[in-house]
Amino acid sequence: MKNKSIYPWVVVGLLWIVALLNYMDRQMLSTMQEAMKVDIVELNKAEAFGALMAIFLWIYGFMSPVAGIIADRVNRKWLVVGSLFVWSAVTFLMGYAHNFHELYWLRAVMGVSEALYIPSALSLIADWHEGKSRSLAVGVHMTGLYVGQAIGGFGATAAAAFSWQATFHWFGIVGIAYSLVLILFLKENPIHNISIKKIDDAPKEKKPSIISGLSLLFTNWAFWIILFYFAAPSLPGWATKNWLPTLFADSLNIPMSEAGPISTITIAVSSFIGVILGGILSD
């Protein structure tokens, strides 16, 4: 663990699994409508199911900037551990939901907890990787998201084999257990802690306020270009991720237990290749 050349990649490996769980838990719901609507009748309406998917994205979007501010001020290891534990507990509790409203609010809490993860994780990776390994490390970490997305497609397969309640329970238990593993093995970079201490101990230097930081950001044209770059593909991207399993099942008459994996794997494979190549080229 103390080997400086190895541990930065151990961090990537540890967070890779968290990234997998992050997308797996959010994606699995999109493939489980058919199994769940037998017990929760509101899910027979496309509008209700769409609202269930949308509340997560709305809250995730609004919380992401807040999560970045929090990650700059709180121990990031514990932020990662806490967010993983909460969203995994939410996944577990979704197996006990009896109506649409319970699912709706649990999905909202998941949006808050999952939003806290990415800023903390990327900041940790950046601290442990300097120079030419940083972009590759971020790219490798991002592949965990897409593998998790692909595995989430098997939620319908597991629900068909067992039950949707058991699927949520076991997926949630895996995340809760792994949060305990992170407590033991995930570490902050000591250099980061030293840098923070120097800033705190410097009496003459005035810390920039959140408002001044946001003002600087919002007046930067590069920020708006990058924001548009990510927003433009996200609209059709999330619509596709959330509804492609249903489209395959309804329009192509493919059983949802097969439509789920097919729809998520096809998107995940291309994304996986893209982030790895992008990381290598960026370095």
PLM ranges: what are they?
Residues 141, 145-190:
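Helix-loop-helix hairpin linking two adjacent transmembrane segments in secondary transporters
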Residues 29-30, 218-275:
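Extracytoplasmic gate region of multi-pass secondary transporters
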Residues 1-4, 190-226:
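Juxtamembrane intracellular "pre-TM" segments in multi-pass secondary transporters
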